[in-house]
């Protein structure tokens, strides 16, 4: 065993003049900065192959601001959903006038929750900077903060090695370039990690605020209700040694209800704004709408393409996530991280279809990275596992090249492009 592990040797602090920065801050920031620099190079090189947009070869791709061919880094990061966010940041949400030829676009914009484009739009107004520059600043700041919070969340129970692994692999994940593109993933990850950390620290009222903000960013709050439930059960079981105050009971109950119900917050607001206009896209991708139309994500896709064998296979995946979550492999992760590890991918299996865009959904499934290391002792760095983590991260970085080239870039090649 001694030959396989080594004591941590990284400096616990980093001095910048008179400022002392702890490892829990500088390490995730350095990892995020270096990987985003790599992402800049990958995106900038891939931009050379982008066609001019809008393009008659791709009539189904919405384009708010026309781009020339080879638009450069700042042009490429605003592709796809970024065009809808640019529209909202520039024009806001509004109802179309009667006879407006672009009326469907105005209504479809309601499909995108408001927090991310509102922040970008406010920055554009205050600074006068372009949409792409504001996106870069906001997402890099949000992504960096997300990594610091993620590190703190995991380090508290699993130690620095596990926390560093989660930050490293998440930053190197195949879809991680979206942390610097015009997508809401960076803010969403920051809010998810913040909610989990606040629950772990029993700051339930602040967690409610973070959940509401998350519901206005991405429709992923229902799994957090399960996290709150499991957290409450664990606290109830240990109430003899750790009594639960009445205010904490109320806080957990409110947090659970808000987590479950807030997934409909934006669609409810939209219905009020549109006053019954049926053409709005606000329910696109929502949990309730998926159930109403009889779509159950991977289960439906598996049945349509493989039959009941496929459904059974997806069901076994659900069981596998639960089994791993309660196994010794995850024993040091903390109940909140263990629960999110299982319930968020299960949530995706039920509500997200099988398509190339699923890679970006898994950016929020950051505990999956911990499977690379399991639950080592807090103060140890298992050498073999460390090598495995580095190798997996390098491979993932390499895979970013084809992913960006095929998913983020719109090329002149025939056929339907991948979706980021």
What are these regions (language model features)?
Residues 158, 195-206, 376:
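Membrane-interface transmembrane helices that cradle and orient dolichyl/undecaprenyl
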Residues 1-66, 251-255, 385-391:
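Start-transfer (signal-anchor) and selected internal transmembrane alpha helices
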Residues 181-187, 358-359:
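Short acidic/glycine- and proline-prone juxtamembrane loop motifs at membrane-interface regions
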Residues 76-98, 102-128:
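Short hydrophobic/aromatic helix or loop-helix immediately within or flanking a transmembrane segment
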Residues 35-56, 214, 221-342, 399-407:
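Membrane-lumen/periplasm interface segments of specific transmembrane helices
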Residues 129-134, 150-172, 190, 339:
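Transmembrane-helix signature of polytopic, membrane-embedded enzymes
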Residues 253-260, 378-411, 418-419:
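Signature aromatic-anchored transmembrane alpha helix within multi-pass, membrane-resident enzymes
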Residues 120-125, 134-157, 322-324:
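Transmembrane-helix motifs of polytopic, lipid-linked glycan transferases
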């Amino acid at each position: 065993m001694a030959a396989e592990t080594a004591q941590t040797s990284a400096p616990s602090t980093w001095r910048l003049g008179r400022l002392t920065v702890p490892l829990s801050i500088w390490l995730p920031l350095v990892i995020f900065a270096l990987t985003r620099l790599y992402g800049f190079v990958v995106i900038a090189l891939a931009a050379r192959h982008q066609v001019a947009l809008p393009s008659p070869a791709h009539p189904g791709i919405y384009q708010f601001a026309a781009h020339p061919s080879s638009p450069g880094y700042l042009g490429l990061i605003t592709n796809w959903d970024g065009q809808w966010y640019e529209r909202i940041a520039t024009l806001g949400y509004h109802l179309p006038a009667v006879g407006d030829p672009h009326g469907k676009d105005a209504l479809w914009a309601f499909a995108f929750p408001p927090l991310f484009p509102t922040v970008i739009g406010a920055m554009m107004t205050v600074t006068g900077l372009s949409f792409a520059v504001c996106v870069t600043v906001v997402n890099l700041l949000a992504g960096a903060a997300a990594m610091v919070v993620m590190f703190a969340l995991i380090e508290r129970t699993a130690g620095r090695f596990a926390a560093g692994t989660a930050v490293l692999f998440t930053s190197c994940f195949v879809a991680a370039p979206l942390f610097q593109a015009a997508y809401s993933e960076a803010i969403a990850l920051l809010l998810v990690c913040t909610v989990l950390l606040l629950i772990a620290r029993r700051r339930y009222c602040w967690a409610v605020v973070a959940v509401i903000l998350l519901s206005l960013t991405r429709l992923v709050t229902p799994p957090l209700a399960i996290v709150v439930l499991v957290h409450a059960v664990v606290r109830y079981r240990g109430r003899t040694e750790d009594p639960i105050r009445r205010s904490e009971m109320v806080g957990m109950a409110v947090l659970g209800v808000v987590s479950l119900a807030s997934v409909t917050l934006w669609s409810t607001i939209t219905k009020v704004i549109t006053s019954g206009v049926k053409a709005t896209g606000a329910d696109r991708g929502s949990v309730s709408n998926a159930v109403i139309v009889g779509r159950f994500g991977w289960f439906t896709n598996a049945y349509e393409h493989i039959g009941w064998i496929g459904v059974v296979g997806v069901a076994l995946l659900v069981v596998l996530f639960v089994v791993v979550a309660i196994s010794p492999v995850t024993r040091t992760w903390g109940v909140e991280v263990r629960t999110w590890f299982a319930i968020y991918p299960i949530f995706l299996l039920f509500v997200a279809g099988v398509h190339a865009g699923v890679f970006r959904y898994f950016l929020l499934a950051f505990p999956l990275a911990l499977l690379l290391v399991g639950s080592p002792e807090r103060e140890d760095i298992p050498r073999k596992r460390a090598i495995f983590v580095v190798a997996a991260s390098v491979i993932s970085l390499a895979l970013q090249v084809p992913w960006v080239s095929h998913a983020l870039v719109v090329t002149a090649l025939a056929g339907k492009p991948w979706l980021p």
